[in-house]
C-alpha cells in the first residue's frame, strides 16, 4: 500500500505544473527555503524556488495547472481582499509593503498617470499624488487666460467653427 501511495505522489510531481514569477517577492532571490515558504503560504502554490532568469535571481512559484486542484491563495494571505497584510520580515526578498495594487490616474503608482481625456500632457510626476483639476474639454492642454468675451479676438477661429 505504501508503494502505491509513493507512485501516486510521483505521478503528481510529474503531472502538469505551471511556473509563475512570485507576486509577493521583491528583490533578488537567494533563499530558496524562504521563497518556497512564501509561495506556499502567501500565494497558495505547491512549491517555490529561486532561479536565475534574464540575469536576475527571481522567486518562482509552482502551481498545479488544473484550476480545480489550485484553489488560490489561502485565506488571510497578503493581497487577499479584506485581510490585513502580514508584517514585513527581515532580509532580502521581503516586501517593504504589500504587493502593489492598481491605482487611479494621478496616483503615485506605476509609470505615471494617464493623459487627460481632453488631450495635453499629464500632470508633473512626483507631486502630492492628488492630480488636480483636468484641463478644459477640447483644450490643447496649455495654460493662459481665456479670450475676452465677445469680439473677434483677432486670432484664428475656435476649433469646430
Curated annotation (Swiss-Prot):
Compartment(s) of residence: Secreted, Cell wall
S-S pairs: 18-65, 29-50, 35-59, 39-61
Record carries keyword Signal: yes
Regions of compositional bias (Gly residues) in chain numbering: 126-155
Pfam families: Gamma-thionin
Cellular component GO terms held in the UniProt record: extracellular region
Highest taxon of the lineage: Eukaryota
Ranges for region Defensin-like domain: 16-65
PROSITE patterns found in the cross-reference section: GAMMA_THIONIN
Biased composition annotated in UniProt, kind: Pro residues: 70-88, 96-105, 113-125
Keywords tagged on the record: Cell wall, Cell wall biogenesis/degradation, Disulfide bond, Secreted, Signal
Signal peptide from the UniProt entry: 1-8
Expression tissues: Epidermal anther cells.
BP term (GO), one: defense response
Ranges where the record places region Disordered: 70-161
SUPFAM superfamilies for this protein: Scorpion toxin-like
Family that this chain belongs to: Belongs to the DEFL family.
Stated role: Anther-specific cell wall protein which could contribute to the cell wall architecture of epidermal anther cells via intermolecular disulfide bridges.
Protein known as: Anther-specific protein SF18
Organism: Helianthus annuus
Amino acid at each position: 500500500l505504501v508503494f502505491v501511495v509513493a507512485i501516486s505522489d510521483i505521478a503528481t510531481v510529474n503531472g502538469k505544473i505551471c511556473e509563475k514569477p512570485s507576486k509577493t517577492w521583491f528583490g533578488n532571490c537567494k533563499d530558496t527555503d524562504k521563497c518556497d515558504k512564501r509561495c506556499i503560504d502567501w500565494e497558495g502554490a505547491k512549491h517555490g524556488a529561486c532561479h536565475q532568469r534574464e540575469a536576475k535571481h527571481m522567486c518562482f512559484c509552482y502551481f498545479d495547472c488544473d484550476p480545480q486542484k489550485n484553489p488560490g491563495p489561502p485565506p488571510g494571505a497578503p493581497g487577499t481582499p479584506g485581510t490585513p497584510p502580514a508584517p514585513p520580515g527581515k532580509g532580502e526578498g521581503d516586501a517593504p509593503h504589500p504587493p502593489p495594487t492598481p491605482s487611479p490616474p494621478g496616483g503615485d503608482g506605476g509609470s505615471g498617470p494617464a493623459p487627460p481625456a481632453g488631450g495635453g500632457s499629464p500632470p508633473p510626476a512626483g507631486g502630492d499624488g492628488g492630480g488636480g483639476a483636468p484641463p478644459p474639454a477640447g483644450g490643447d492642454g496649455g495654460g493662459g487666460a481665456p479670450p475676452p468675451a465677445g469680439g473677434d479676438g483677432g486670432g484664428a477661429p475656435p476649433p469646430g467653427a
